[in-house]
Amino acid sequence: ETGRAASAEKELTMEMAPPIFQLGFKADPAPAGEEHLREQLMGELACEALLGSSSPLYAKLYSEGLINKNFGYGFELYPGCALMAAGGESRDPKAVRDAVLAEGERLAREGIDEGLFRRLKKGVYGAKVRGLNSFENVCIELAQAHFAGVEYLTFPGVSVAISKAHAE
């Protein structure tokens, strides 16, 4: 698969109120092994910094009524494939897209606020630990990690070593 998206934009018009949108951003796939797990954790942190409910962008879009409680986002990393996706309902999906792109550029230029990064890192780590309470989640994570050539349960040590610079 090429490093570029097949098309920059695809729009389908249907009678729906409110409109539903999905944004996708292709990322470089990670190599197998511990680097795969590190990239997964860094991608999740970067996604939270950009789109998470604690991020400045989320607060702005929500207060302006451009997104609602149905807004969702995530970072996925598989052997040979990586992506960030976000979607939900919006009266102006293009304004959401433009705001996400602008905030991504701002974060790349200025970096992530140190306090926000520390909170997000604790939150992502906490979510991983809480995920251990779900047998289904553990099975999925172990299987995906196996195919990526890494031991999933090493995530605590890998997580500790991730710095703000890694997520930026």
How would you describe each model-predicted region?
Residues 1-83, 88-168:
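Mature, solvent-exposed C-terminal subdomains and processed small-chain segments of exported/organellar
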